[in-house]
Amino acid sequence: MALDIVNWKAIVEALLYAAGDEGLTKKQLVTVLEIEEAELAGIMEEVAAQYKEDDRGIELTEYADTYMLGTKKEFVPYLKKLIEVPSKGLSQASLEVLAIVSYKQPITRAEIEDIRGVKSERILHSLVSKALLCEVGRADGPGRAILYGTTPVFLEQFGLKTLEELPPLPENAEEDVLQEEADLFFENFNQTFEDIK
């Protein structure tokens, strides 16, 4: 079924939105859309131009052959206001993910999900939007998964000067089964959180 350029742009936008902060590679887009790379390049130029011309808060970015949607820099002051929320407003699941990242960083989403035993994409997006976590690099290997780490905002929100102020993990933490490991992270992190309240 042939689609015109407007429909292609809408489909690309939907795909990039669904992909979140991991974005999609050129290869992934070409495969999903079943088009040639040259055609994709033209579509992406149209999408990027539309975001630049329109009065929108997001833009199309390209990094290492990966496309993603991101917030325009001029709106950063408003995002900073948004993330200035009390840490007590975080859910138990969010605290658990923060605990895992703070002890294991840099860490991929897949590794976090292995430890927790449940999907964590939505929580990660929320924590990134609050500037408590950020992308600190890309993992080696297929897919070049995003590596997550904590931010200065994380330290500030939890009353820490450095990550070294987190309570040490027991020596046998690495030998525990994954669920026990997640429980241990959360217990230690929650204790730190209680100490600084």
UniProtKB/Swiss-Prot annotation:
Looking at the keywords, is Zinc-finger present?
Answer: no
What is the protein's known function? Participates in chromosomal partition during cell division. May act via the formation of a condensin-like complex containing Smc and ScpA that pull DNA away from mid-cell into both cell halves.
Matches recorded under Gene3D superfamilies: Winged helix-like DNA-binding domain superfamily/Winged helix DNA-binding domain
| Protein name as annotated | Segregation and condensation protein B
Q: Which family does it belong to?
A: Belongs to the ScpB family.
Q: Which InterPro entries match?
A: ScpB_csome_segregation (IPR005234), WH-like_DNA-bd_sf (IPR036388), WH_DNA-bd_sf (IPR036390)
- Database matches in SUPFAM superfamilies: Winged helix' DNA-binding domain (SSF46785)
